[in-house]
Amino acid sequence: MEKLRELLPKDQYEKIAAINNPYLHEFLAEWIEWLEPSKVFVCTDSPEDEEYVRWKALYYGEEKMLEIPKHTVHYDNYYDQARDKTNTKLLVPKGVELPFLNTMNREEGLKEIREIMKGIMRGKELFICFFVLGPTNSIFTIPAVQLTDSAYVAHSEFLLYRKGYEEFKRLGPTKNFFKFVHSAGELDERKTSKNLDKRRIYIDLLDETVYSANTQYGGNTIGLKKLAFRLTIQRAVKEGWLSEHMFLMRVNGPNGRKTYFTGAYPSMCGKTSTAMIPWENIVGDDLVFIKNVDGIARAVNVEIGVFGIIEGVNQKDDPIIWKVLHSPVEIIFSNVLVKDGKPYWNGMGIEIPDEGENHSGKWWRGKRDAEGKEIPPSHKNARFTVRLEAFPNLDREALNNPCGVEVGGMIFGGRDPDTWPPVREAFDWEHGVITMGASLESETTAATLGKEGVRAFNPMSILDFLSVHIGDYIRNYLEFGRKLKKTPKIFAVNYFLRENGRWLNEKLDKAVWLKWMELRVHNDVDAIETPIGYIPRYEDLKVLFKQVLNKDYSREDYEKQFKIRVPELLAKIERIWKIYEPIDNIPEELFKQLKDERERLLKAKAEFGDYISPFTLEKRI
């Protein structure tokens, strides 16, 4: 504490002294001394401290005001627009091998990042902020402390997470907290990170600390988001619960029944549009914790806000998000085009000005970058950051419930033109975890240009964020389900089937699949058994299409969408098998499930041929 007394002005020192936690004090003293900021501000949970951070983001030029009250814009460096996968490394002890993951020797990594960060905050203000992941004072709560010299990063976290200063005071001397140290480094005249050659995001799994330097882009800097996610996955696998890259939503069933679903979809597979269906309710759009509470799987949203991709958001397809983005609620727009105080983005469905300011500086239509590429009005990864409370379809009770909500179903959303049917249900937990979750693929969206895209393997949509061996991750999933008294049903969806280049489904058909899944969770409708799980009966979907979308649904459409495509399904099993086969430590159950599914498909092929009509299988029941 003496060291902190020397380093901090009296008013800021008193805020830290009120937290009785020597581990925290030691960490802060070490890093304040090392970073050498000219000024330190400690954020409590007071509205005044949050307002101070908001004001400093404008004062230091990291954000600018827009025309609508409470709206601001932030720009990242032209070359700092996405997660830096190359320089994001997991620091692991010598000899640890993690397939698919970008690892580095822990001692070397810590030495390098300390050198880069020595004195990096000279002439700058350090913000020390306290937050929690999950609801406060709950079995899901994980406290975290963020050190950053970016008021934009701190402001973003106030929109995305629950405040945690009082929680730190309540918890007292615990080591059970995450630590994030970030510096944007030297800034250029546009107030964006300058030294991108020294951009590093190092995740120390042993000490549950993340270091991030010379970057501002949210995915590299907002400690509690995807950086903390690596730490929570590791902790979940150690402790036997699930930390997942999933939405959490409520589907409204008959007679006021509420059923909650989680959903894991790789990008461009329909995750946000599913969670935002206007007549259902959102709890969260990105990260969930799922724990076994008295034999029931219960889930919480880790966050209280949305850090969403803005590209393509338009009034017709995204009425709720569109309305929020035009309301006077607190929003940070990043890397969009601004003209006369108004933000514009690609695909917004209205005319975009021919000039303005964007992530490249002064912009005009046809402007090219150093590589000769034409610069679009907004970056394809441009974002909006806003609290969930701004959404009229928010299920507030579920968001704030410290016990979480019961998970009725888990959805895995893939993207392919010719393999998975639009919706199906797993035979059981193990079958779903392996053949749906651990086999998830998404066709890269080059497909929309008429080229067949590459199928990217992305189990549980978590590959970019894994921090443990994939075998341990899958084993934990299987074990978690075995210990439940009541397991959630598992479903797989695919909104992107095509035939002769035409989509087989319309955008809103997914609303019908959700209602069918809700009925299946409660065993209200029968289903057809196929070699790959249960699919809907035509009669049930016909009723739902009329009820939900007021649409007629033809037998022909049903047959095209739900036929079992045996050759493509067998090819997929082959692909997935080849990915897992060379890796050590993969649970036996994975190969058994794939083998059993292959045998069921071959048997069906021998009886019915390569392409099997759902009506043929229904007759057999």
UniProtKB/Swiss-Prot annotation:
<dbReference type="GO" id="GO:0006107">
    <property type="term" value="P:oxaloacetate metabolic process"/>
</dbReference>
<keyword id="KW-0312">Gluconeogenesis</keyword>
<keyword id="KW-0963">Cytoplasm</keyword>
<dbReference type="GO" id="GO:0030145">
    <property type="term" value="F:manganese ion binding"/>
</dbReference>
<dbReference type="InterPro" id="IPR035078">
    <property type="entry name" value="PEP_carboxykinase_GTP_N"/>
</dbReference>
<comment type="similarity">
    <text>Belongs to the phosphoenolpyruvate carboxykinase [GTP] family.</text>
</comment>
<protein>
    <recommendedName>
        <fullName>Phosphoenolpyruvate carboxykinase [GTP]</fullName>
        <ecNumber>4.1.1.32</ecNumber>
    </recommendedName>
</protein>
<dbReference type="GO" id="GO:0042594">
    <property type="term" value="P:response to starvation"/>
</dbReference>
<dbReference type="Pfam" id="PF17297">
    <property type="entry name" value="PEPCK_N"/>
</dbReference>
<dbReference type="GO" id="GO:0005525">
    <property type="term" value="F:GTP binding"/>
</dbReference>
<feature type="binding site">
    <location>
        <position position="286"/>
    </location>
    <ligand>
        <name>Mn(2+)</name>
    </ligand>
</feature>
<keyword id="KW-0464">Manganese</keyword>
<feature type="binding site">
    <location>
        <position position="383"/>
    </location>
    <ligand>
        <name>GTP</name>
    </ligand>
</feature>
<comment type="function">
    <text>Catalyzes the conversion of oxaloacetate (OAA) to phosphoenolpyruvate (PEP), the rate-limiting step in the metabolic pathway that produces glucose from lactate and other precursors derived from the citric acid cycle.</text>
</comment>
<feature type="binding site">
    <location>
        <position position="415"/>
    </location>
    <ligand>
        <name>GTP</name>
    </ligand>
</feature>
<dbReference type="InterPro" id="IPR008209">
    <property type="entry name" value="PEP_carboxykinase_GTP"/>
</dbReference>
<dbReference type="InterPro" id="IPR008210">
    <property type="entry name" value="PEP_carboxykinase_N"/>
</dbReference>
<keyword id="KW-0479">Metal-binding</keyword>
<feature type="active site">
    <location>
        <position position="269"/>
    </location>
</feature>
<dbReference type="InterPro" id="IPR018091">
    <property type="entry name" value="PEP_carboxykin_GTP_CS"/>
</dbReference>
<dbReference type="Pfam" id="PF00821">
    <property type="entry name" value="PEPCK_GTP"/>
</dbReference>
<feature type="binding site">
    <location>
        <position position="245"/>
    </location>
    <ligand>
        <name>Mn(2+)</name>
    </ligand>
</feature>
<dbReference type="GO" id="GO:0071333">
    <property type="term" value="P:cellular response to glucose stimulus"/>
</dbReference>
<keyword id="KW-0210">Decarboxylase</keyword>
<feature type="binding site">
    <location>
        <position position="226"/>
    </location>
    <ligand>
        <name>Mn(2+)</name>
    </ligand>
</feature>
<feature type="binding site">
    <location>
        <begin position="217"/>
        <end position="219"/>
    </location>
    <ligand>
        <name>substrate</name>
    </ligand>
</feature>
<dbReference type="GO" id="GO:0006094">
    <property type="term" value="P:gluconeogenesis"/>
</dbReference>
<dbReference type="InterPro" id="IPR013035">
    <property type="entry name" value="PEP_carboxykinase_C"/>
</dbReference>
<keyword id="KW-0342">GTP-binding</keyword>
<comment type="pathway">
    <text>Carbohydrate biosynthesis; gluconeogenesis.</text>
</comment>
<dbReference type="GO" id="GO:0005829">
    <property type="term" value="C:cytosol"/>
</dbReference>
<dbReference type="GO" id="GO:0004613">
    <property type="term" value="F:phosphoenolpyruvate carboxykinase (GTP) activity"/>
</dbReference>
<dbReference type="GO" id="GO:0019543">
    <property type="term" value="P:propionate catabolic process"/>
</dbReference>
<dbReference type="GO" id="GO:0033993">
    <property type="term" value="P:response to lipid"/>
</dbReference>
<dbReference type="GO" id="GO:0046327">
    <property type="term" value="P:glycerol biosynthetic process from pyruvate"/>
</dbReference>
<keyword id="KW-0456">Lyase</keyword>
<feature type="binding site">
    <location>
        <begin position="268"/>
        <end position="273"/>
    </location>
    <ligand>
        <name>GTP</name>
    </ligand>
</feature>
<keyword id="KW-0547">Nucleotide-binding</keyword>
<dbReference type="InterPro" id="IPR035077">
    <property type="entry name" value="PEP_carboxykinase_GTP_C"/>
</dbReference>
<feature type="binding site">
    <location>
        <position position="267"/>
    </location>
    <ligand>
        <name>substrate</name>
    </ligand>
</feature>
<feature type="binding site">
    <location>
        <begin position="381"/>
        <end position="383"/>
    </location>
    <ligand>
        <name>substrate</name>
    </ligand>
</feature>
<feature type="binding site">
    <location>
        <position position="83"/>
    </location>
    <ligand>
        <name>substrate</name>
    </ligand>
</feature>
